[in-house]
Amino acid sequence: MGAIYLLFFWPLRDPHPAVPAGHGALAIRDAKIYVSPDAPAIEHGTVLVRDGAIASVGPDVTVPPDVQILPCDHCVVTAGFWNAHVHFTERKWSFAAWKSAAKLNAQLADMLTSRGFTTVVDAGSDPRVTISLRRRIETSSLLGPAIYTAGAALYPPRGIPYYLKNTLPFYLIWFMPQPATAEEAVRIEERNIARGADLLKLFTGSYVERGRVLPMPESIARDAADAAHRHGQLVYSHPSDLAGTKVAIDSGVDVLAHAPDSTEGVDRALVGGMVARHMAMIPTLKMFATTVTTDPAYLEPIYAEVRQFHALEGELLFGTDVGYMTDYCTEDEFRALAQCGLNARDILRMLTTAPAGRFGVAGQKGSIAPGKRADLVVLNDDPERDITAFARVRFTVRNGRVVYGQ
């Protein structure tokens, strides 16, 4: 019994550790500072951080002599980035409660902090892994981002996607919930929340075979979503096609975790309906090109959906599906978003203020202002001159602590 507890339950302890207060001071001087996507940039500005919070920002900030200075020659500073769609499902994350800090720090840097991510949303993983990572990060034994997790995603009855069956260990498939009734879905969601989940992920449309999508019964999706909303949690959906998107809309989903990639029937009226309901979308454009096909006949209709959603002033969140997609570089996502008509300010909004607002923490993070949490990204170049500069990160600072530096 002791071994079973150690393996299955001990990693789930303390699922929401308190974020420790930051200590010390640092400054970034003579930088171009984008305090938010909508404010004018500060040229030759300084950001001063004390005890994990922004102390001051502006062109005339005095830096005391005892403050650590981050070297920054003509660099650019923004608020810390969010990746609103990640997964900790690669085998290298297994047994995260016990792996060495050095190994996990290297993996976190490679996948996340070297890309500027100070906050990430895990859209479905083994909670024993994700909760262990979060606990070790928040107790300062690891250098990593803040983690929101959906815990175990919910699938339609007999609706595990074919690509997960082909890639995940067989024993994990056993634990992937496929509720047959609305009542069962609610019980699973309540259990998820008790184990530390911060949001709900529904596969409202699941590719059970290549080219065939199985929609989730609307009653199951709706009751599960209602359960999450009663706890103040957001609901994500993997929609896949028209039917899956309609289930997402009708069941009260808040965020599409992908643009629907089977685009037939996903027209302007449907997109407008999503925007009217204040749904957000995470495009994950590179993922489609990397894991499905680079055929323009497949990709261009997806890009057209994103263009239309953006033109109708729908809220877009940045996310890459990294962890499922094992190419961690973010450059291609930025290029693809630019192809959809987004400029640097639009993309900065996706990376910062939009997710902070959607998750209800805009008063704490998402922009650079005195009193806010010192989550910062230092870039080598200006994304207003080159959109891929968002991918060239020099330093990542979370809660006033340098968690990545070149």
Feature map (PLM): residue ranges:
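Alpha-helical scaffold segments that flank or form the walls of functional sites
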Residues: 95-143, 176-198
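Histidine-rich, glycine-flanked metal-binding segment
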Residues: 13-14, 18, 24, 33, ...
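Divalent metal-dependent hydrolysis catalytic cores, especially in the metallo-beta-lactamase
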Residues: 107-130, 144-152, 197-207, 234, ...
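Histidine/acidic-residue-rich catalytic or RNA/ligand-binding cores of hydrolases
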Residues: 92-95, 130, 245-253, 287-312, ...
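Active-site core of metal-dependent hydrolases
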Residues: 202-300, 322-324, 341-343, 357, ...
